[in-house]
């Protein structure tokens, strides 16, 4: 039997036996594929011993599925992403469907009714919205459910873009020859808000590399690069940039997640330390510098804090 799992993570595929040892859950039988939207979760499943194939893609794989199991709920993903994935499952026409819903029965029924009440309707869940920095052109950016800050500008990202665009423009005004061509690395790029705003604000050519672990973010960033006419190399990665890109960037920008005790921020900043040239500048942003500043100082001893829009932009120079 061919089974597709949607919304499951590696911890959902194991249970503890009587001795407390981890073993695969008993229902993992047959030809099972687990779809993930994030390459980190894909790698976690691949490196486990559960015997499940992992696929990481922005959309569900098309096949003649005997069973599709979907795990979702308000604490697992946004309602819009749940509905988007449920619609994709409906369009796959699996022989059987099972929903594991972590939430109220009323919310479960409401989610299912959106498909059952109008089964022939195919919704477009993408969003297009404007963003700009002072003195820069207005960009129309596209995002998809699952992207960070889908349908709206993230204030922290906008604060970061405004500070970096302003500082780079001033630097080029006074020392343009030393900064040409300009190489920018945007890590955790999402749909590309920060990278594209900074690149579009500069008069001199910019080489833009963007990295994200989420396939829908990568899909959106590639689409926006093409639509905006801003050349960008967009990479799907949960471990920063490849070694051949070390010591090659003038500027690093990142808006690292605050959860997981800043472990993801460590990956961001370790990448920045590797990827920047000597004299390159690392910019990160957070709501409160108290948590991120000590992490950044582990990689860059000197940290300057620039306040913008109620956020703290942390600036460091690689020695």
How would you label these PLM feature ranges?
Residues 67-79, 187-195, 249-261:
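Conserved proline-anchored active-site loop of SAM-dependent methyltransferases
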Residues 74-134:
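N-terminal auxiliary segments of SAM/dcSAM-dependent transferases
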Residues 83-94, 266-278:
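A short glycine-rich, Lys/Arg-flanked "PGG" loop and its adjoining helix->strand segment in the class I
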Residues 57-60, 236-243, 310:
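Conserved SAM/SAH-binding loop
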Residues 105-129, 147, 288-319:
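Class I S-adenosyl-L-methionine
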Residues 1-50, 155-254:
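Conserved SAM/SAH cofactor-binding pocket of Class I
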